[in-house]
Amino acid sequence: MLFTSISFLYYFLPIVLILYFITPKKYRNYILLIFSIIFYMYGEPKYVILMLVEIIVAYFGALLIDKYKSKEIFLITIIIHIGLLCVFKYTDLFIGTINSIFKTNISFLNIALPIGISFYTFQILSYVIDVYRGKVKVQKNILKLATYVSLFPQLIAGPIVRYETICGELDNRDETIEKFSLGVRRFIIGLAKKVLIANMLGELCTKFSLVDERSVLFYWIFAISYMLQVYFDFSAYSDMAIGLGKMFGFTFLENFNYPFISKSITEFWRRWHISLSSWFKDYVYIPLGGSRKGTLKLVRNILIVWFLTGIWHGAAYNFILWGLFIGVFLVIEKLWLSKYISKLPKVLRNIYVLFIIMISFIMFNAGSINEAFFNIKGLFGLNKEVFINNYTIYYLKSYLIVLIIAIFGATPLFKNIIEKLKKSKCLNKIINILEPIFLVILLLLVTAYLIDSSYNPFLYFRF
């Protein structure tokens, strides 16, 4: 089930909210658990069993780890979860690699990827690791652990919520009118970002893939549009997840912090998909030694993390290329580039970041490595195409307003303007009156679009 579907917005969510708030507090987790499983079953009925098996393994594994302080039990539990992720996500990549290297003809298994497996597996792993480290207390109520893992606001596309951040809220959380209203506001803003901006940018990117007569300018428009589409698509889902969490009394950590204003690649990845970046930092990079054990190990650790980050996003070589490309730039910045770019004007540093990230997302989007390099060459006119043509002019005119809104919306500009206006008591009152009206208008526009549109999944569902 999609957050951006009529069935979710006007049937599932209202029913869950009504039943949740009329239920006594001590039973509300059960309502969330039941409806989270129904939510998942709507799209993946057979893979509910897989998720429940992983929850059971994590529950008993953590209990045994806590009781016996056993490294062996810890490793077995971790291997089971990583093993299941690898089987369902990487089997065909492995078979394809074997076929390419050894010229064999092993048939692909074509295993369907369970929605959200990368996200909920990482949540389970963080819980088990933190229990082993003594960072969190083991959860002795399997239903509470199941609620944590399967909580529908963040189940299928994050953010990756750590057990330590919401364990207290599983037992006791504040559900206030203020928190609920903030949740509704955040959810509607995320909904509008997805439907009115990300989907429109996605249409433009689709047009690019269908046009035979491309131009150099069209390659640039596509590259910028796709980069913005990924941002608005995924940050929109995070907004909706955080908003839904607030409605039910949970506080999820922020997942994006205006990454496109960054002045270095390092800063960009502190601001983009924060829950994933911090996960790899805490559970892979630091345990490997981080930056403490010499230059060679620093390089090794960064490249390992970014190889894993790339392959986490998808079982294809373009994702590995994307991850290693980012990793190499992070290494270069760490070793020497940062001291030079820090002397440049802020605008030039920002342009440098945007260019590198744009190139990386061309790799991220490509169906193959050859396609990635072909599209990168197109940016520089190396595919023997004209600089501009009629197709480019037509599509630029058609999507110019959306592009402008997206470019400025990816910065704190609108937020800063509103905050400055709110410093005036008079304007603050006007904004407080107009904001609910604006949100209702957004919801109506989104609803009209959804009624008239087809399937519009989030990009990160495939991860």
What are these regions (language model features)?
Residues 1-462:
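Membrane-embedded transmembrane alpha-helical bundles that form the catalytic cores
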